[in-house]
Amino acid sequence: MASLINIGVSGLGASQSGLFTTGNNIANADVAGYSRQQNVQSAKSSIQSGNVFIGTGTTLSDVRRVYNAFLENQLRTTTSLNSDASAYLNQVSPIDNLLSDADTGITGALKSFFTALQSASAKPTEDASRQLLLTSAQSLSKRFNTISAQLNEQNSNINGNLASMAEQVNKLSATIAQYNDQISRVSAVQGSPNDLLDQRNEAVRQLNELVGAQVVEREGNFDVYLANGQPLVLGKTINTLETVPSKTDPTRMSLQLNRGSTSMDITSSITGGEMGGLLRYRSEVLDPSMNELGRIALVVADSINQQLAQGIDKNGEFGAALFGDINSAALISQRSIAQAGNSAGAGNLDVTISDTGKLSTSDYQVTFSSATQYTVKKLPDGDAQGPYDITATPLQEIDGFKLALNGGAPSAGDSFKITPTRNAAAKLDTVLTDPKRIALAAPLSAVSGSGNQGTGVITQPELTSKLDIYDSTQRIDLQNGLKYSTPVKLVFGDETTNPQSYKLFDAKGTELSSGTIIPGESNTLQLSVPMVDASGNPIMDGVTQKTFNFEMTVAGSPKEGDNYTVSLTGAGSADNRNGQAVIDLQTKATVEVGANGKGISLTDAYGKLVENVGGKTAQAQMDSNATNALQTSAKAGRDSLSGVQLDEEASNLIKYQQYYTASSQIIKAAQEIFTTLINSL
């Protein structure tokens, strides 16, 4: 009887364990990372009875996790990829909308500015149209400022998110190390701790949501490594992540791995997870977009200011700048960042924009090999240019900018990050406040002599000597020369000779130059005028008198004595030729201008930026969809094996209930047999 009762009791125990395991599966059905468990039963040792062996019941040999390491690793990998793609998409989508939308992007503001410029140029004497142009210029500069502010805010958010995620990574690393410790201790004496193993797996999966990590199982422990092979967790030991300002750019946070007393920058090697997506977005979209937007802002300010300086305003004065000076003392000092660790006596570098048409959208690394010699490398992986001499005259031009020392001399090994265009959009401002100061008129105007008899016709003179707003000496000399060396008079000789002669005289009647034309044809005259100051003294360039040059076309047949007077354009002129020249900047190749003079326009440059960001956004959406599908598939694969199927567990409940009832019947039968036996005595 004892054997039959023991068999029944073993069945009761096994069925009860089955009910416990099934109930535990059902209770944890929605717990992330939980692997369903199965009871593993085995028959107890049989006993010999005569020449046969009779069973003695069952025993619970194990409660097994239904687990597959390959499926778990696949889920971790796809989780990392999807988190990366989602983080990237979440960052790039709003910027794509910002740049491409007509109400928030630059295209609409740029179009409105040039439309207002066309109106002002069509009515150069009206103050209302000039005021509208000023308002449009202010709107344009504010639009640049607003977009730049949002890009900078996004950078700040990325910095904050990286710091927060680094803390989460450290907490998860510590959790994994604790699980390693607990699992090692429990496994040594009590077998496999299923729930701890599941919880450790889930912690690793959550870690992969933040950063791509690989697991190597060693003696029951999980060693966790980053993509570059640097360890986060080694058994019970963890290495911590920390965000610190980048040594080359303190406005960008970098990631540092702390291993005991040593630290290393691992920013460039972080891939996967939200961190990888944020860093990838920052390097692929955010920084290039800020640089491109800044380059466009620099070209807008420089090209428009340069052209307006060539003209005459409504007051009869030389043109004033519409936008702020792109090479102000404050701006040239903000384009260079001294690397942390430079020698104590080293100052910084001043970065002067010398040719906006040659600017790229890259940042640069400048490294000194001595106090004066340096090389320049286009980031992130360009070839080194140079060496150059920082004290050379003139200064070396590099992709449209020049470098000069600001402060103490550097030492060998000192390095600087150069950001020629990074902050330009934020600094663009409209400085002109008086609409009368907008220089829409060309500087020189010509009138025909009142007594002219011939059929000669001239075009208005075009000043071919260009004023440089960044060279104060050249600018002042040319303005004085135009002001005090005019008017000049062009007088034609005997019309019966062919070619017909002409002479150019100054205001005192002194002959300046002479030449000939072919009567009846279109003749382009290139004329040069020696420059004098307000006192009539020559304006000199060393030992040579400076001149300004202009050209005009003469057609028809002038009579002898016919003349044309070329003067500085006066106040209130209806001339709009300089305004038209500014309008032409809308389509003129002013960006990425190569040695052959070919480039792209402002509108095309911004369109290229929008197209690039739009392309990145479209690719990010496809990547997000693809990685989401992969993650969903990986999770489904894992859940199909390890997940709790409630229908199956409900069936198991019924099975174990029946098992329990049947086992109790065995005991009941044993009791009845025992009772019958007792009663028969």
Summary of predicted features, one role per range:
Residues 1-681:
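Structural signature of extracellular appendage/secretion-system components
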